């Protein structure tokens, strides 16, 4: 096993432990709590994959961080913080929308790289909007926290979430997963659009209405409809 992989996991475990103290003292806001919960699931998945105990890893991670801080000068720390780019956390969904349980009558699940796509194939002829909570850096999506598909009535009918066992994903990974989810929902004649936030940062293949361009299947269907009317 790569020692760098192990030490990275150990440090992440300790840093999560430190961050956990913030909400314990009633200091964390909603985005902070979102990331904390997601990171906890990710650490559990990584620990299972690596075969490492999280409690033991946290102790070792503390030793690594303490050693680094002991060697780090205040001036070097200031320079590092000044040069580090700042990311922004954007939210389409409320805490309730993110944490709400949902059920599928005809479940379908697909893994696309480090992302898991779930949708209910029983949903037909609905207007659906995709919403997501994610961080942005350099005007591009950095980390997807969670994406969900909602009907006009507010029911959840689809979801894209990071796989805890495969941390890390790119903007292209997210864009590809969105394409898969949209394609699956549109197969049952649903009309899908993305939120303005997603359209700006993660799904640039949309038209001015926030909808993706028509697929070949949709174009053929539209052509048949037009011919029948003529």
Swiss-Prot record:
One of its GO terms (biological process) is symbiont-mediated suppression of host type I interferon-mediated signaling pathway. It holds the Pfam family Flu_NS1. Residues 217-230 have a biased composition (Basic residues). Residues 180-215 are annotated as: CPSF4-binding. Keywords: Eukaryotic host gene expression shutoff by virus, Host cytoplasm, Host gene expression shutoff by virus, Host mRNA suppression by virus, Host nucleus, Host-virus interaction, Inhibition of host innate immune response by virus, Inhibition of host interferon signaling pathway by virus, Inhibition of host PKR by virus, Inhibition of host pre-mRNA processing by virus, Inhibition of host RIG-I by virus, Inhibition of host RLR pathway by virus, Interferon antiviral system evasion, RNA-binding, Ubl conjugation, Viral immunoevasion. GO terms for cellular component: host cell cytoplasm; host cell nucleus. A motif (Nuclear export signal) lies at residues 137-146. The keyword Lipid metabolism does not apply. A motif (Nuclear localization signal) lies at residues 34-38. Residues 223-230 are annotated as: PABPN1-binding. Residues 205-230 are annotated as: Disordered. Upon interferon induction, ISGylated via host HERC5; this results in the impairment of NS1 interaction with RNA targets due to its inability to form homodimers and to interact with host EIF2AK2/PKR. It is found in: Host nucleus; Host cytoplasm. The keyword RNA-binding applies. Residues 1-73 are annotated as: RNA-binding and homodimerization. One of its GO terms (molecular function) is RNA binding. Gene3D superfamilies: Influenza virus non-structural protein, effector domain, S15/NS1, RNA-binding. Belongs to the influenza A viruses NS1 family. The dsRNA-binding region is required for suppression of RNA silencing. Homodimer. Interacts with host TRIM25 (via coiled coil); this interaction specifically inhibits TRIM25 multimerization and TRIM25-mediated RIGI CARD ubiquitination. Interacts with human EIF2AK2/PKR, CPSF4, IVNS1ABP and PABPN1. Inhibits post-transcriptional processing of cellular pre-mRNA, by binding and inhibiting two cellular proteins that are required for the 3'-end processing of cellular pre-mRNAs: the 30 kDa cleavage and polyadenylation specificity factor/CPSF4 and the poly(A)-binding protein 2/PABPN1. In turn, unprocessed 3' end pre-mRNAs accumulate in the host nucleus and are no longer exported to the cytoplasm. Cellular protein synthesis is thereby shut off very early after virus infection. This is Non-structural protein 1. It comes from Influenza A virus (strain A/Leningrad/134/1957 H2N2).
């Amino acid at each position: 096993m790569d020692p760098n992989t192990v030490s990275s996991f150990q440090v992440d475990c300790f840093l999560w432990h430190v961050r956990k103290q913030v909400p314990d003292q009633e200091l964390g806001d909603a985005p902070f709590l979102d990331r904390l919960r997601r990171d906890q699931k990710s650490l559990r998945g990584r620990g299972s994959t690596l075969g490492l105990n999280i409690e033991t890893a946290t102790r070792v991670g503390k030793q690594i961080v303490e050693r680094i801080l002991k060697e780090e000068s205040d001036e070097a720390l200031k320079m590092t913080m000044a040069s580090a780019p700042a990311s922004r956390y954007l939210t389409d969904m409320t805490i309730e929308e993110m944490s709400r349980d949902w059920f599928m009558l005809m479940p379908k699940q697909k893994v696309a790289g480090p992302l898991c796509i779930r949708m209910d194939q029983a949903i037909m002829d609905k207007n659906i909007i995709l919403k997501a909570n994610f961080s942005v850096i350099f005007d591009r999506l950095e980390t997807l926290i969670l994406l969900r598909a909602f009907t006009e009535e507010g029911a959840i009918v689809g979801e894209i979430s990071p796989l805890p066992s495969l941390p890390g994903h790119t903007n292209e990974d997210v864009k590809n997963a969105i394409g898969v989810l949209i394609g699956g929902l549109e197969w049952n004649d649903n009309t899908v659009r993305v939120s303005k936030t997603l359209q700006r940062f993660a799904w640039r293949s949309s038209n001015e209405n926030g909808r993706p361009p028509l697929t070949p299947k949709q174009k053929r269907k539209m052509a048949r409809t037009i011919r029948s009317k003529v």
